[in-house]
Amino acid sequence: MKTRDLHVISIRPLLPPAILIEELPLSEKGSVVVSRARKEVGHILDGEDDRLVVIVGPCSIHDPLAGLEYARRLEAVADELGEDLRIVMRVYFEKPRTTVGWKGLINDPHLDGSFVINEGLRLARRLLLDLVELGLPSGCEFLDPITPQFISDLVTWGAIGARTTESQVHRELASGLSMPVGFKNGTDGGVQIAIDAVRAAAHPHRFLGVTEQGLAGIVSTRGNPDCHVILRGGQDGPNYDTASVQKTLAALRDAGLPARVMIDTSHGNSDKDHRRQPAVARDIAAQIAQGEPGIIGVMLESFLVNGRQDLKDRKHLVYGQSITDACLGWEMTVPVLHDLAAAVRARRKVRQ
């Protein structure tokens, strides 16, 4: 009598990471872009660089062409504001779902339930390479210990989401990632699980993963010293206000960790209303302008077109508009970035 795979329909071969990396290699110029951006973000986390990290981009990438157009626009602004902001494009290919729904470009690149994951991995890597060649750093959320083998060499900053921060697997994964990683507070608003995650990820771990050849393996990590908390609000309301920020910074100090936080202007902090993101950003900017050194970064959900659309007919989607969470349109995004840059300049004067 069969006792295994009773609920499994099929298991298809996964492209080995080494094959995809050989097919779409990172150039020497590109490796310099990634390494330099990671170092810059690390210096900001350590307080050696007084700029602000800004993770800005679509809730999720569903159309690489629109993503690349957004990147070209963002790269120009990143150059303009580079003395005050280290802008990193949010490039999320995987979407954790509360129940069910489209799980992202890697999982379902054709948006039709065909789940051609090998092609999704190829599209994701190609877009990240395009961004690197533009000179624009990228930030991704990681949902499993396998996908990073295909794309992590191209990523400047990583995120562990609110639904997975408490997961041992994701803390172990973060301990081995080659870039700074942010842990979001839980969906209930609890910050302690993110603080615990930062502590855990700083230590060495052993866990199951895959090699570049696609074989199952036992991964041994050194621990990641460049992890931090992301405040994203929760069921009990937002936590971007001064009192919440100071409470979190104090909790980090009590835990023996660096007092540094990134703040997400979306999700629970905007009450899931994308139009509130500029107001949230203004509040954060005011705290920065008053001299607060513990705020090291801000996250914004932004795309070419304001709002969102349902994935009903993939042939008639609005170009440049999100199919997951609603985003700020480009015209509303640029003033927010300028406001944050002005806040950094004000903080610089206060702290001189």
Range-by-range predicted roles:
Residues 64-76, 99-107:
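Glycine-rich loop at the start of a catalytic domain that most often binds anionic cofactors/ligands
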Residues 57, 263, 329:
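Conserved, mostly hydrophobic/aromatic
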Residues 53-66, 325:
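Conserved phosphate/anionic-ligand binding catalytic regions in large, soluble enzymes, centered on
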